[in-house]
Structures are given as C-alpha cells and as structure tokens.
Amino acid sequence: MSQLWDKEGRGSIPINWTISPGLVDFGPALLNYYYDTATENDCFASGPSGLGYSLIYDSHNYIWNSDSGEAISPYVKWTQQYLEKSGLRIITIWDEINDEQRSAYARYCRYLYGLTLQDWEHQPYKLPTLVQDRNLPVIANLPCYANGVDVIYSFWQDTIAKFDGSKPLFLSAQGESWKMGPDNIVALKERLEALSPGNIVICRGDHFFNLYRKANGLPFNLTLSPDVTVKTSLSKTSSDLVADGSAAEKQMWVSGTDDGKAWIQFDFKKKYLISRYVVRHAGNAGLPDSLNTRDFKLEVSNDGKKWESADCQSGNTMPVTDVDIVPVKARYIRLSITDSGEDQRARIADIEIYGSVL
C-alpha cells in the first residue's frame, strides 16, 4: 500500500483505502502515518470483514463458512471496539452475509456508516441494496476486484445512461489496488461524465453513505453537509476541524483558552429532526484520557438566540460520548463546555450530529 500511497496524483480525487482496524494494536505507527499524510480526499475503510480477514461466504466455492447471526455476534462486537479506536466507518464484507448476520452488524456496530458486499455476478445485480433493520445501509460492490477502468465502465454504462435525474443513483465498485490508482479513477470519471454530463460525483465512502442515508430518509450526520457553518469560542486551530469526519490528533479542534470553558455552534441552515449526537474527545485521538472533556451540554435552537438543553453530561472520562436524545426539531446546535479536563483546555477531535429531513 505504501507504494500506491506515494503515487503521484493521490488527493486529486476521492479514493477509499482498505486497511485493518487491528493496526491499532500491531501497527500503530503505520496507522498514524497514513492518517497524518492523508488528504481530504483519502478515506479509510475496514478490510474484510472487520477485525481481521474473515471470509464469511466464499462466492467462488458457494460455501458459507458461517451462516449464524449468533455465532458472528462476538466477532462483530469486537470489531466495533476497533472501529472506534481506528476511526474506520465502513466495512467491506468478504464476500456476503445473510439477514441474521447483517442484523448483527446493524445492532452491534453502531459506529458504522455502511457495509459493502462483494457481488461477483454480472448484471442484473445478484445482491440487493438495502437498509438493514432501518439503520444500516448495505450496498454491493459491482464489479468487485475490477482490474481496470474498462471493467467498471462496462458494468455501469447502461445504468448511468438511463439515469433520468428523478432521484439519486448510488453505485459502488471495488478495484484491485495493485492495478488501479488515482489516475485511473480520474479517467473513469471522465468517461462516465460523457454518459450523463454534470451528474457524476466520485466521493469518499463516508460521504457516500451519508448521502445515501439522507436520500432514503434515515438519520444522517449533519456535520458532513457542505452548507453547514461552524462557529466556536476562541481557538488555536480551525473551527472546521470539529466536523471534518476525522478524529486524528492533527485534525483536532483546540481551545485558545485554558479556563475550562468553551463552546462550538453549528448552523444547518434549516430545521432537522435531531435524534443523536457523538463527541470524540482527546482520548479518541490518542491523547491521555485525562484530557477528555468532563462537563458539557448539548443545546438546541431554531433562531440562534433562544437555547434549550437537549442533554447534559457530567464527570465524563470516556473518549467517546454517544447519546440518543429525545428527538427535537432544531436548526442550530451548540456544545457548551464547562469543564475541559485535566489542563482545562478543551480538545474536541470530532462532533457528529444526526438528524432527519423534516
């Protein structure tokens, strides 16, 4: 991967790179290197099928190595822990999973934006695109393990040519990394544009699934929306870092004061039904847990002037705060911090606010 990573052109177009969440334990320096040198167009996803290479269904030999949702649940729970530690939001399954197994991922991998499966068939699709248990998008990579632009183009050509613009069309493919690079993806986009001018968007996996959630009426991470604006109290780093989708230390928001108090405010430009929020503190970025934000509250507003409390946390020591709140309609969200941790300088690695279109 390091050879591909150093190829000229990386960062010019969104690409999703599969890595192992186990790097947290057996290769933390490697994981840090990739995060530290990633561009805003590089997105990391978990390789098959979570923590370690697990071949659940062998498509070539038509063999289920496991077909039990109960049997796979401990593995999925363990995977969830390492997804949080590694910051990975997408898993590509090797090759397929059944309904019981999809339910296990939906139930125990709360951190996931979505799953991709490997569809080895030709059109029409063998594997359906679906939302598992009303909260986890599952999309097939068709083609999978494509060895060049021509292969992907041949699979997508007819579908894109028939696109009428009435609703979004989501397509996912997997390329052989040792045979494809950024230049190939650029060439693919140019060829697809000729089929449907102005309608082709190549995007990161986290953005892909976030847009899919929005298009299908599911709660989605509002902080990834392109029109959101962020304001903060005095800070040492850019306010954009509180909602860039990364919990890496170099992309952490840091308060400009050390009096323990700080605030972060989002304007989503219109009202949404807010139902969940996630705060990733200093510990989630690899810093000591003693620097995690201790006391804070989530406030909501429709005009940016009158605020109401939606949730309050006191004495927090955990690196991640993940809370389902009573659904509330709001345009503005504010995180108000009153105790920033050991040195009283607030550090927020990332914030996610989940809402649905009204």
Task: Go through the PLM ranges and name each one.
Residues M1-R10:
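Non-catalytic propeptide/linker segments at domain boundaries
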Residues M1-S2, G22, S86-N216:
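Catalytic grooves of carbohydrate-active enzymes
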Residues S59-S68, T129-R134, N216-L218:
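Short, surface-exposed amphipathic charged segments that create phosphate/polyanion-binding patches used
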Residues G22-D25, L51-Y53, I97-D99, E176-M180, ...:
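Short, solvent-exposed loop/turn segments at secondary-structure junctions
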